Amino acid sequence: MAANEKMEVTVKTLDSQTRTFTVETEISVKDFKAHISSDVGISPEKQRLIYQGRVLQEDKKLKEYNVDGKVIHLVERAPPQTQPSTGGPSTSSSTSPTSSNAAPVPGAPERNGNSYVMVGTFNLPHVMSGLVRQQRPSVSTVNGNDGSTLDVHINLDQQLPVQSEPRVRLVLAQHILQDIQRILDRLEGQAVNEQAAEPMDTAESEGEASSRETLPQTTQNTDGQSNTTPTSHPSPSEYVEVLQSLSRVEERLAPFMQRYREILSSATSDAYENQEEREQSQRIINLVGESLRLLGNALVAVSDLRCNLSSASPRHLHVVRPMSHYSGPMLLQQAAIPIQINVGTTVTATGNGTHAGHMPSDGNAAQPPSTNTSEPQRPNTENQPPSNGERPASDAPPTSVPHPHPRVIRITHQTVEPVMMMHMNIQDSASGGPTTIPPPTAGHGGSAHIHMPGLPPEFMQAISHQITQQAMAAASGQQIPGFQAPPRFVFTRPAAPSFQFQPGTATTPPGPGGATTTVPGATVGPAGNASLAQMISGLVGQLLMHPVVVAQGGSSTSSSTSSSTFTSTSSSASSSSSTDTTSTTTTSSTANPTVSSVPSSQPPPGTDQHLSQLLGSLLGTASSGMSNITMGSPSITVTVPGMPAFLQGVTDILQATQTVPVSTAPTQSASQAPPPSSPPPPPAHSSPPPAAAPESLPPEFFTSVVQGVLSSMLGSLSAADQSGTESIAAFIQRLSGTHNIFQPDAEGPGGFFGDLLTLICHNFSLVDMVMLLHGHSQPLQNLQPQLRSFFLQEYLHQVDPTPNNIQMASRNLTNGLEEYIRESFASVTVRDDVDITRTNIEFLQDQFNRITTHILHCADSTFGQRLLEMCNQSLFEWLALNLYCLRGDQNALTSVINERIRRLSLDVSPVLVSWVTSVLSLRLQVLLGQMPVTEGEIQRHVRRVGDAPQVPEPSSQEQPMETMPVDCQNGAASPVLATHSGGVLFLPPQSSVPTICPDSDHPTQEDGGSEQWAASVPPEWVPVIRQDMQNQRKIKQQPPLSDAYLSGMPAKRRKTMQGEGPHLSLSEAVSRAMKATGAKPESSAECVRRELDNSEAQGRYREQLCQDIQKTLQDNESYSAQRFPNTQRAFRGDP
């Protein structure tokens, strides 16, 4: 390769702009970043180049990634640890407000400063273990300044005063106006980073300072006192200030709007020969258009604010439509998995402390309150809320112990292009001095590090998709017709044990009156914490998919406008120690006045037990960690859209379990960590149900529960069919964007198993599959007629279901799997003395015999349950059998299954296949860990090398007994010997579908004619031809091809392309037409076959068929008798 050769690379940035660079082919990735840094405005150390889902490494050359002429994506990376990890005064408390989509201010902490972890691991620092143990969390969410972000604030300390949505609207408008100010500065030629000169600062500080100062001041409660500070609603005067700011922005924008109109009026015909003039005009169009978009969002944010003049003074603002009105779920039909999202989501969790230690002398108490005014309400660059100890020095006596600084965990869900990351910021950014945050020890109910269960891939995709739609809807102000705030339901969870309390007792949540009670028998252990952590990880999707503006406590009967709340009413007794103070215990009896019906004592008997069974199945939590705790339980309030049946089911189960005794078993021990949350296994694999009592959860209730959970998890992915009746085939076709995955004769898995999979996917919905996976057999019971008809047609080929015929069909079916089995196990190590191919074939024969006999002969109400038990037992035995053959190597068994799935899914989206294999691998680990089948039970299925094969059946039954129709027996008694320029080939009989003779004494045509063709070929060819004939009978035939197509085809290909031509049998033609169209007869298939086999109807059909073909040949101008002599001979004269 010459040294002067060039390559052209296109770089696409997050603002959807593309730039093309021509560089040397030998340039490294590091040098390329430096080359483009001046054009993209991002320094090389912050650049992250992504191509086809891979991050380009700096030590490699650009040509190694084959990006010549391709498009690579550029995102701004998060530099590790740009802020001090311990102590030291923070520099962010006095920084001017900065928008998330603006350039960072010099000297201010980076937006992505501190450490981060990729989504899927959730390896959070030890502080997270302290946060999940905090009590009385409150949640509020705020849409971003331009509608493209969503902030979820989770305060895990005492209930803060509920912030009103009108104030959030005003703050949102103020932030949007700040962004417009920055754009106007750019238009006017000012520097981007000159934030101090913005006229908006004064109005923002005046409007926001009160909201920020009110929030910390109202939380300075002393022990034993109730928080009764009213909600901080904005006054109309604050609204007036925002409107004045809007007017000033419009005045500044007016001259640029005039120039904007002039440019657009002449844009149609202007030549723009001057490049500088063209670029300047293009810059004005882009910036003014962006300003108009932001201005519209600001107007939408404040347009719903109202003031009721008939109310008593002082009057305040309220909203006529909540924010959720603009953020209903929508579906982007043009997008398929993976959904690439250009939106950033910030989740901020704050918790004020259980660490009761002295603040250092240079703490925030000595800072003037004026430092608050420059700190934004919604976390942007700093993303740090003000400290609760932030007040004038006169309010903080030197001898008092002020509240410690809040600890902040900011989870930045940066779904920019394919990159998603979580950003953990656990430092005191709002304080002026360092604070000591000791890691909890095992004695405090936690460990140095806690592993949060990772969310499944499709869960994060659904969350990302949902957030995108809400952000787009909020940004555009689009109304969702008929959208109502979804109903809420309450899950009761066990309270997390406190840090320190008297032995044998635990403080329960205070009631509405402020009194506290104690419950004996509570023990300290990490089980409750891990259980709550699992609930947080499982419900974070709810918090993100259904945002709220007002955090409202209460029960499921609350009429709050919030669409999702997460509240915990566990005990607030906690203590911690610092390096210079002794341990203290502070008990707060603060009662949120909005919490009126949350129980403050023991829940109804049996509620925890039954809901633990439900949640343990659906959310992957440990039932023992839920049902075996009898202390006061925090309530988790979640929203499920459009699920009145689900709410009714919850009410029914709570009422039905009033008399169930409470479990008094001890709490789960520290060594028994709850399993991580896992989604339901994919439909492509069956798994046994968990050991749950089916009588406690009726099928109707379970169906409504599954519909609600799937609706919440899949979000807008299931928006096309909220009833839960969409079939799996329709769901996959909608996601993949193709329509031939499960169509008859489509490419993909063929033969009997492909048709069976098609039948299941067309008749089962996702709800049905989840019900089966959890032990409910009703879907199989409903599928009984279709299964019986399918096995009669495809398995037995319309013969009587006698034991002999079923065995022959099973043998013929499994013999065709020999090559697949040998290929699948070729890459793994098998026991030396085990014939794994024979072991699997004979095992499958036995299982198919049992299952087929049950499907064809069972007609009572136990059909579904027994079939499900058979399938589960077969699955466990197959796993145990092959695990034994593979020397107990679980990884080898998993790789065999995943590799087979990949081979069968070549035409399916690779992302979908990867998700199926990864989830299936996790599910297999769970199944293999609780294997109920022992090695001794499966020894009877093991076939050793050198063992004598089973005695075959008589020769008349060794091969499928071919009983050819009377019309074609003469021509099909032996294979047709065809000659061609390519050589001699043997064509299979015209009827390639094997038909089993119901009468065992009927002579077979193959036996009668085998000597005729066997004598005409060399003896060594006979077994080869017989095997080839057997294999071809199992191949799903393709549609007939024209003679013109076949005439130009080589002999070897033409041999496999021979169709059956027109179906001269009326019953066969109708049967195939019914199968192709999915039609079902009103009567049974046997009755239809008997009626169609009538000799008179058959004769009329043959006559009409020949007439139609003759008419087609006469009317076809391109038909040539010399070119198609066989057709002329076949259809001349009467039939």
Curated annotation (Swiss-Prot):
Comp. bias regions, Basic and acidic residues: 1087-1099
UniProt-listed Pfam families: BAG6, Bag6_BAGS, ubiquitin
Key words, A-Z: Apoptosis, Chaperone, Chromatin regulator, Cytoplasm, Nucleus, Secreted, Transport
Bias (Polar residues) ranges: 212-227, 367-387, 1116-1129
Subcellular location: Cytoplasm, Cytosol; Nucleus; Secreted, Extracellular exosome
Comp. bias regions, Low complexity: 79-100, 228-237, 555-600, 663-672
One GO MF term attached to the UniProt entry: misfolded protein binding
Region called Disordered, residue ranges: 76-114, 194-238, 350-407, 498-522, 552-612, 661-698, 1075-1099, 1116-1135
Domain Ubiquitin-like residues, every copy: 7-82
UniProt-listed GO biological process terms: brain development; chromatin organization; endoplasmic reticulum stress-induced pre-emptive quality control; ERAD pathway; internal peptidyl-lysine acetylation; intrinsic apoptotic signaling pathway in response to DNA damage by p53 class mediator; intrinsic apoptotic signaling pathway in response to endoplasmic reticulum stress; kidney development
GO cellular component, as recorded: BAT3 complex; cytosol; extracellular region; nucleus
Keyword Nucleus part of the UniProt annotation: yes
Biased composition (Pro residues): 673-692
Subunit structure comment from the entry: Component of the bag6/bat3 complex.
Known function: ATP-independent molecular chaperone preventing the aggregation of misfolded and hydrophobic patches-containing proteins. Functions as part of a cytosolic protein quality control complex, the bag6/bat3 complex, which maintains these client proteins in a soluble state and participates in their proper delivery to the endoplasmic reticulum or alternatively can promote their sorting to the proteasome where they undergo degradation. The bag6/bat3 complex is involved in the post-translational delivery of tail-anchored/type II transmembrane proteins to the endoplasmic reticulum membrane. When nuclear, may also act as a component of some chromatin regulator complex.
PANTHER family, A to Z: LARGE PROLINE-RICH PROTEIN BAG6
Protein name: Large proline-rich protein bag6-A
Species annotation: Xenopus laevis (African clawed frog)
Gene: Bag6-a
